[in-house]
Structure formats: structure tokens, C-alpha cells
Design a protein with these regions (language model features):
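Short, glycine-rich nucleotide/cofactor-binding loops
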Residues: 32-38, 123-133
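The conserved cystathionine-beta-synthase
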Residues: 132-141
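Glycine/small-residue-rich loop that forms an oxyanion/phosphate-binding "nest" at active or ligand-binding sites
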Residues: 90
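A glycine-rich helix N-cap at a beta->alpha junction
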Residues: 79-83
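Short, aromatic/basic amphipathic alpha-helical patches
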Residues: 67-78
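Boundary-proximal intrinsically disordered activation/regulatory segments immediately upstream
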Residues: 1-61
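Acidic/glycine-rich phosphate/pyrophosphate-binding loops and surrounding catalytic core
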Residues: 96-120
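Conserved small/polar residues in nucleotide/adenosyl-binding loops
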Residues: 143-144, 148
Length: 152
């Protein structure tokens, strides 16, 4: 049974995950097996659950609790579900929530080198990348570079 909690106090430490911790603090570099990530839409939350990620809590617009989020909340089990009106959430997070729903989850264990490299023809090592958007940009640039090299 989910624990639906209406947000009235933004100072609650339980909301730090969503409002006050940096990406680096969520990642927990010193103990990566205890790292956390934020899934930022119903589709991403569902995919993370399908992949076996373990939810910690959810933050969403109040209107989604009995509608769009009902099945996701059921799948998450007995976790806190923080809910508030749209304007209240915007004040808390400082930005417009993607599809009105966030879910804090434990990061899955990192795979070993052997598992990553098994069957790979090429491997790119990207160090100190904090924003996944940068990985996409690097991948696109690499693809264009390969195409250009083949045309010569």
C-alpha cells in the first residue's frame, strides 16, 4: 500500500533528493553502490522498474496519484509518494516537472569490465562525463567522423 504524503513543508529532509542534492551528491562517488538517480517521466520510471531498479520515493503532481501514476505507484510498492499541486512543485524544484512525475531510485550495480567488453568490436572510454547529454553528443560526433573518413 503506497504512503501518499501531501507536501506542505519544503524543509523536510525527505525532499532533499529532489530539491537540494546535486548530481554529484546523488551519484555518491565515494560509495557508488549507494548512488541514487532520478527517473523523470512515467515512461522512464516504467523502463527503470522493468530493468529491476529499486524505487526509493516518488514526487508528483497531486492529480496524477489516482490517474496517470496509479499503476506505477502500485508497481513501486510501499514507498513514500510525495504529492502537491503543480504550482507548489514548481516552487520546490525550481523547474517545470517532466510530465509531472519523478521517482528517486537506487543506481543498479555497475557491470564489470569483462561484461562490458564481451562481444564488443569497438569501445570508447569517456572519463569524467557528468551529463548523459554529453555522451549523446560525443556519439553523434563520432558517427559523423566515421562517415567522413569513409568518404575519403
Amino acid at each position: 500500500m503506497p504512503n501518499i504524503i501531501e507536501i506542505t513543508d519544503f524543509a523536510a529532509p525527505e525532499l532533499d533528493i529532489y530539491a537540494r542534492l546535486t548530481e554529484g551528491q546523488l551519484l555518491n562517488r565515494h560509495e557508488p553502490d549507494k548512488g541514487i538517480f532520478i527517473a523523470e517521466s512515467p515512461k522512464v520510471i516504467e523502463r527503470a522498474l522493468d530493468a529491476g531498479c529499486v524505487p526509493i520515493s516518488m514526487l508528483m503532481e497531486k492529480k496524477h496519484v489516482e490517474r496517470q501514476a496509479r499503476e506505477i505507484i502500485r508497481r513501486c510498492g510501499d514507498i513514500p509518494v510525495y504529492a502537491a499541486e503543480f504550482d507548489v512543485l514548481t516552487q520546490l524544484t525550481g523547474f517545470h516537472l517532466t510530465r509531472g512525475m519523478l521517482c528517486a531510485m537506487y543506481r543498479p550495480p555497475l557491470p564489470g569490465t569483462e561484461e562490458i567488453c564481451a562481444g564488443a568490436r569497438r569501445i570508447a572510454v569517456l572519463e569524467n562525463v557528468m551529463n548523459p547529454t554529453n555522451i549523446g553528443a560525443i556519439s553523434v560526433s563520432y558517427t559523423h567522423l566515421l562517415r567522413a573518413a569513409k568518404s575519403y
